[in-house]
Amino acid sequence: MKSVITTTISARDAAGRFPSRSDLESVQGNIQRSAARLEAAEKISAGHEGVVKEAGDACFAKYTYLKTSGEAGDSQDKVNKCYRDIDHYMRLINYSLVVGGTGPLDEWGIAGAREVYRALNLPASAYIAAFAYTRDRVCVPRDMSAQAAVEFIGALDYVNSLS
């Protein structure tokens, strides 16, 4: 799984070189932020049902047309699938926080997502709205520490930047 550490080592190994000072500083920074990432991952794990529900509710509140006939949320089954997708991405964000890199999102979440959404007529903007709501809702210190929030928000923004 891709992380700052595995990416650094793989690149240097492919070049037949030792990691540079800059490489090691990057790895060290990643390790120093690990406690904050793990805190964010723990908080997400503990309350993911509520986070997913609020994100999905915000999405459907912003895009009310999604529940009209022929749209992505025109039946309870389709609405449930939207919540399932949000939950899936939250898990991938959680995994990315744990490993300290975007590997889980890149490998399991982003690849092909645009094509699937287009094929199923699912608007990416609705998912972006759900994650933007989650990002904007994070409250320090109610939800997590400031550094944990920075890590979590960074992961949410990463997902939104690729959509």
Swiss-Prot record:
Cellular component aspect of the GO annotation: chloroplast thylakoid membrane; phycobilisome
Processing and modification events after translation: Contains two covalently linked bilin chromophores.
A biological process term (GO) from this entry: photosynthesis
Main localisation: plastid
Keyword Plastid part of the UniProt annotation: yes
Superkingdom assignment: Eukaryota
Keyword annotations from UniProtKB, A to Z: Antenna complex, Bile pigment, Chloroplast, Chromophore, Electron transport, Membrane, Photosynthesis, Phycobilisome, Plastid, Thylakoid, Transport
Localization of this protein: Plastid, Chloroplast thylakoid membrane
Membrane topology, as annotated: Peripheral membrane protein
CDD domains for the chain: PE_alpha
Binding sites annotated in the UniProt record for (2R,3E)-phycoerythrobilin 2: C139
Binding-site list for (2R,3E)-phycoerythrobilin 1: C82
Pfam families: Phycobilisome
Gene3D superfamilies: Phycocyanins (1.10.490.20)
Entries under SUPFAM superfamilies matching the protein: Globin-like
Sequence similarity: Belongs to the phycobiliprotein family.
Function: Light-harvesting photosynthetic bile pigment-protein from the phycobiliprotein complex.
Subunit field text: Heterodimer of an alpha and a beta chain.
Protein name per the record: R-phycoerythrin alpha chain
Species of origin: Aglaothamnion neglectum (Red alga)
